Amino acid sequence: MSTHADSKPWTVPALAEAKRNGQKLVMLTAYDAGFARTFDANGVDLILIGDSLGMVVQGHDSTLPVTVADMVYHTRAVARVLQRALLVADLPFGADATPERALDASLQLLQAGAEMVKIEGAGFKVDIIRYLVEREIPVCAHLGLTPQSVLRLGGFKIQGRGDAARQLVEDARAVAAAGASIMVLECVPTPVAAEVTAAVEVPTIGIGAGPQCDGQVLVLHDFLGLDSGHRRPKFVKDFLAEGGSVAGATRAYADAVRDGSFPDEQHAYAS
């Protein structure tokens, strides 16, 4: 099985090739140059500037207060040091409310160094994704638990159970057809995430979505066992405890994702 060379910078087309080759993708969030440099040098394939920074960096109770300016600042800091990992940046809450707003925010993020933008949800967002892709902006979709929908959802809850599973699969097909290059599946039962992964040609990146996704992502503070001021989800594992250092934890996480040992049943939702 051919795999992406460790020293070769990641590109958007290489992500789909990785899925075809059965190569697991390793993703982490980062918000500054120091952590990003360490992750980049120790096996991380994609780095996400997540609007999770609103909770773990800024101290908010949700991601809703994060602005485009916040995202641009952190994107610039991370982009300066990356040599290998592909850089993805979130469109924050409200920035993708219309095609024009999404385009403006996306251009700012790409000019700051991002190589892809992430959009939460389906529905009218499918047309937003298509609009951006038609304008040469790579997009990462995000389905399942979408933190920007926390008010509507009534909290951070598992998605895709029961009748909602079929809708999730349909949404995945829709965002893939619209041109999304990859998609994050968050807090989705393992069997449903496996069905989505089999239904689409683009790579799926799981976070609380079981081991059958094409890759995994964790929030920096969670995978290092740091206190972010919020309850730790079931799917989180403290890799610093076994890695002994940030670099060691990163290598341990990357190895566990690639060999399929993470996530195990303890760190996933069976139903």
Swiss-Prot record:
Enzyme class, UniProt record, top EC level: transferase
What positions does the entry give for Mg(2+) binding?
Answer: D51, D90, E120
The UniProt record lists the EC number as 2.1.2.11
Keyword Chaperone present in the record's keywords: the answer is: no
What keywords does the record list, in alphabetical order? Cytoplasm, Magnesium, Metal-binding, Pantothenate biosynthesis, Transferase
Q: So where does 3-methyl-2-oxobutanoate get bound? A: D51, S52, D90, K118
Q: Name one GO cellular component term.
A: cytoplasm
Annotated pathway? Cofactor biosynthesis; (R)-pantothenate biosynthesis; (R)-pantoate from 3-methyl-2-oxobutanoate: step 1/2
Xref: Pfam families: Pantoate_transf
Q: Where in the cell is it found?
A: Cytoplasm
Record's InterPro entries? Pantoate_hydroxy_MeTrfase, Pyrv/PenolPyrv_kinase-like_dom, Pyrv_kinase-like_dom_sf
GO MF term (any one): magnesium ion binding
NCBIfam families reported for this sequence: panB, PRK00311.1
Could you give the subunit structure recorded for this chain?
A: Homodecamer; pentamer of dimers.
Q: What is this protein called?
A: 3-methyl-2-oxobutanoate hydroxymethyltransferase
